Amino acid sequence: MIDKQQVISDNAAGANDTGSTAVQVALLTARINNLAGHLQTNKKDKAGQRGLQLMNGQRRRLLKYLERTDYDAYIALTDKLGIRRGQRIVR
């Protein structure tokens, strides 16, 4: 089970920060880790596998946005959550 308030307080920039990109990525990461553990024991849960793919895609889009808008926060968040970073695309 995910302790949502704990994840939010660990990644929030301020007291009322519940929807910033960093918080959203942290919550998605917690949900992804929880679902991945479930899928280890329930290998035939196809709906769960699809949900995992959708959450990974959403997290990837949010991380791409964060990388584009605030690169330092992106580096700090990926290090903190243990998420691998892709190569930086300079445009």
Curated annotation (Swiss-Prot):
Function: One of the primary rRNA binding proteins, it binds directly to 16S rRNA where it helps nucleate assembly of the platform of the 30S subunit by binding and bridging several RNA helices of the 16S rRNA.
Cross-referenced InterPro entries: Ribosomal_uS15, Ribosomal_uS15_bac-type, uS15_NS1_RNA-bd_sf
Protein name from the UniProt record: Small ribosomal subunit protein uS15
Keyword tags: Ribonucleoprotein, Ribosomal protein, RNA-binding, rRNA-binding
GO BP: any one term: translation
HAMAP family referenced in this protein's UniProt entry, alphabetically: Ribosomal_uS15_B
Entry's Gene Ontology cellular component terms: cytosolic small ribosomal subunit
